[in-house]
Amino acid sequence: MKLVFMGTPDFSVPILDSLIEAGHQVICVYSQPPRPAGRGHKEQLTPVHAFAHERGIPVRTPKSLKPAEAQAEFAALEADVAVVAAYGLILPQAVLDAPRLGCLNVHASLLPRWRGAAPIQRAILAGDAETGITIMQMDAGLDTGAMLSRESILLAPDTTAPWLHDMLAAMGARMIVETLARLEDDEPPAATPQPAEGVTYAHKLAKEEGLLDWRRNAVELDRKVRALNPWPGVWFEMAGERIKVLEAAVTPGSGAPGTVLDDQLTIACGKFALRPLKVQRAGKAPMTASEMLRGHAIPKGTVLG
């Protein structure tokens, strides 16, 4: 098929790669504009832009698709279909209608649960037992289109966002190729409207969500550690220093929230206790909590912020 791909982050790259490997003619890639990043604030291409550039595929990076000129340029591509995966821009109706078969979205949740920007992290934060991928026919709403394909994956008590990200990207890459094959064979999958019940929204992650509130249940805080690394990261304050928690475990224990209960940095929470296992001090490399404690003791009874 002659298709346009629209995507931006690392999640989208395996999906684009699978379309190329399946023999589809990717005539153009749309991605978000380069943005300053790193200490030098040099402009960096998005992961999808960089990948497409390496493959010699033309890339367009409009700031918006609302201008009539941008919509006309898109329509002039005369694509059979557009595949969208974590693109990050709103598609006006004129864009949705331009490809012969419309626009298909690869979304990292079991819709209608977790519509929106951060479905992978929100599923872990909520303690969901499962999540998955939905392939949908896009409409003008926010992830409200009819579902063409849906597959689930179980979430374990130790599932992390990076692991789930990679699993779902691979699942989405396989599923979109299968969906397009059925469309090519004139055996389109049934378009199932999303149910009205069970709608939730995966709001964009905010930096302040990473602060550990010891008044909460340790189970919730462990979910934060697993969901919010590497970004925005999870941390607590100690003597004015921000210490990141990269891995942790829930343990039995009780005390005033934020109190260090032993020499292993077990910290009392609103319910149960949390023991950081891997941490990172400001300007330092990641280390085990025991390594940090050898050089920077945190006595039992210390109350952390």
Swiss-Prot record:
The keyword Protein biosynthesis applies. SUPFAM superfamilies: FMT C-terminal domain-like, Formyltransferase. Transmembrane segments: none annotated. GO terms for cellular component: cytosol. CDD domains: FMT_core_Met-tRNA-FMT_N, Met_tRNA_FMT_C. Its EC number is 2.1.2.9. Keywords: Protein biosynthesis, Transferase. PROSITE patterns: GART. (6S)-5,6,7,8-tetrahydrofolate binds at residues 109-112. NCBIfam families: fmt. Attaches a formyl group to the free amino group of methionyl-tRNA(fMet). The formyl group appears to play a dual role in the initiator identity of N-formylmethionyl-tRNA by promoting its recognition by IF2 and preventing the misappropriation of this tRNA by the elongation apparatus. Belongs to the Fmt family. This is Methionyl-tRNA formyltransferase. The gene is fmt.
